[in-house]
A protein has these predicted regions:
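Structured beta-strand/loop patches that form or line metal/cofactor-binding pockets in enzymes
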Residues: 1-48
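Glycine-rich, charged/polar anion/phosphate-binding loops
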Residues: 26-29, 112, 141-142
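Short Gly/Pro-enriched turn/cap motifs at secondary-structure boundaries
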Residues: 30-35, 55, 88, 92, ...
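Metal- or metallocofactor-binding catalytic centers and their adjacent structured scaffolds
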Residues: 43-110
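Conserved structural scaffold segments of CAZyme catalytic domains across common CAZy folds
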Residues: 98-100, 110-114, 121, 139, ...
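N-terminal small/glycine-rich loop or linker at the start of catalytic domains
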Residues: 108-132
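Metal-dependent enolase-superfamily TIM-barrel catalytic cores that perform enediolate-based chemistry
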Residues: 123, 127-150
């Protein structure tokens, strides 16, 4: 398996409901007037049809990603050393690092936590933030119950 392309692209859509509900966050705008949500992604493609997808990307990621073309993504340590020699931009390294781990996990049909050595503990406490969800007490209470049930 070899890396054939690294693409950086942006998706745009309307804000999700529940975001920017607080007047101070919107600056007096109605929810319809709030700027559309934009997010950049990076996708690492291979000749085997397996792709690694991660959030984030930039012109630096795009340029650095071109050095991955032709590489075997399973040779992670060698690739990481090459990337580190080419840049000290931690954001660009992080984006490509996450994309490579996603790709390796898909190729091996293993979750990333297992590739990194397995679980450290059997369970963790869940945390659910509700910042920006709703100022209505009943809606917040309903959402709190939903979070507890999950």
């Amino acid at each position: 398996m070899r890396i054939t392309d690294v693409k950086v692209f942006e998706l745009e859509g309307p804000p999700r409901s529940g975001l920017a509900l607080y007047e101070i966050q919107r600056g007096g705008l109605t929810p319809e007037q709030v700027t559309p949500y934009r997010q950049t992604f990076t996708e690492i493609e291979t000749d085997a049809g397996i792709t690694g997808l991660t959030i984030g990307g930039s012109t630096q990621v795009k340029a650095l990603g071109q050095s991955l073309i032709g590489e075997d993504p399973i040779c992670y340590e060698r690739i990481w050393e090459q990337l580190y020699k080419r840049t000290r931009d931690p954001r660009a390294l992080s984006v490509l690092d996450l994309g490579l781990w996603d790709l390796i996990g898909k190729a091996r049909e293993e979750p990333i936590y297992r590739l990194l050595g397995g679980p450290v503990q059997e369970c963790i406490r869940a945390y659910a933030a509700m910042l920006g969800f709703s100022t209505d007490p009943q809606a917040a209470a309903k959402r709190s119950r939903e979070c507890v049930e999950k």
